[in-house]
Design a protein with these regions (language model features):
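Left-handed beta-helix
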Residues: 1-119
Length: 119
């Protein structure tokens, strides 16, 4: 893929590619593609794509997720809430607690098979 990526104090599963991004203090399962994004203190399950310029901190994601470029989660509680509200509009048949959850400590969980678009 050509762009140098960094895996710092982290574990990357088989098939994981970090292209031009940085992953720090995190665990990435199989077939995670980090495309010029920053991930910190997170657990990312199988088959997740994280788009360019996205930033994650304290995120636990399930599998089969697509994160569009420029999504920022875990840095600003108000912005995190806006993403949750947006997801409710994108997936009207799902209950809010089936989409994204935010703990009082700021840990964000994302369920399987969703896309998160930049707002």
């Amino acid at each position: 893929y050509g762009n140098e990526g960094y895996l710092i104090r982290s574990i990357g599963g088989a098939g994981t590619i970090i292209s031009g991004g940085t992953v720090k203090n995190s665990v990435l399962f199989e077939n995670v593609f980090v495309d010029g994004a920053k991930i910190e203190e997170s657990i990312i399950m199988d088959n997740v794509y994280v788009g360019k310029g996205s930033e994650f901190r304290k995120v636990i994601s399930d599998k089969d997720i697509r994160i569009h470029p420029g999504v920022r989660l875990g840095y600003d509680p108000e912005l995190d809430k806006r993403y949750l509200e947006s997801m409710c509009r994108w997936y009207p048949k799902r209950m809010p607690n089936e989409l994204m959850q935010i703990s009082p400590e700021g840990i964000i969980t994302i369920p399987k098979e969703v896309e998160i678009k930049r707002i």
